[in-house]
């Protein structure tokens, strides 16, 4: 069955919430210390408002993957422009326009069917058309699904490590 990658439409919030909860359950099971399922109440409205607002901002982007009339996945991203301050340009990429992928979510039942790849490919094209010279994203390093997806299937390379320490 084919997948259509398209801009979001009013009414997509419910499907986006369903996909978020589906993929989120995987992460909550994988590492319950760091992940939890959000309350379902109000989630669809929240996604609806966010995705529509993103596409009214020239530097933000949202996409929906539709399969058989249902939301099968979605992606949000935004552009980060070069920093004009020299103090921020020690890291070379901060002097470039960057595409930051905020989220790539695919219904867990549809993983490994090319939906995530199609969403990323469309986002990369959008960023390239707007002058981005690099795309960045983050993922949970303990995921046996997302790490191979990004590193082996889509050509992304690890570039940094994020540290965290609880303060309580």
Question: Where are the regions a protein language model picked out?
Answer:
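Conserved GNAT-fold acetyl-CoA-binding loop/helix
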Residues: 24-50
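A short helix-loop-beta-strand connector motif used in the catalytic cores of GNAT acetyltransferases and
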Residues: 49-63, 82, 100
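Conserved acetyl-CoA-binding loop-helix of GNAT-fold acetyltransferases
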Residues: 106, 112-125
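Conserved acyl-donor/pantetheine-binding loop and adjacent beta-alpha core of acyl/acetyltransferases
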Residues: 76-103
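Conserved N-terminal entry element of GNAT/NAT acetyltransferase domains
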Residues: 1-14, 18, 22-25, 29
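Conserved beta-hairpin
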Residues: 59-75
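Conserved active-site alpha-helix within GNAT-family acetyltransferase domains
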Residues: 117, 129-133, 141-160
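Conserved beta-strand-loop-alpha-helix junction that forms the acyl-donor binding cleft
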Residues: 111, 136-146, 164-167
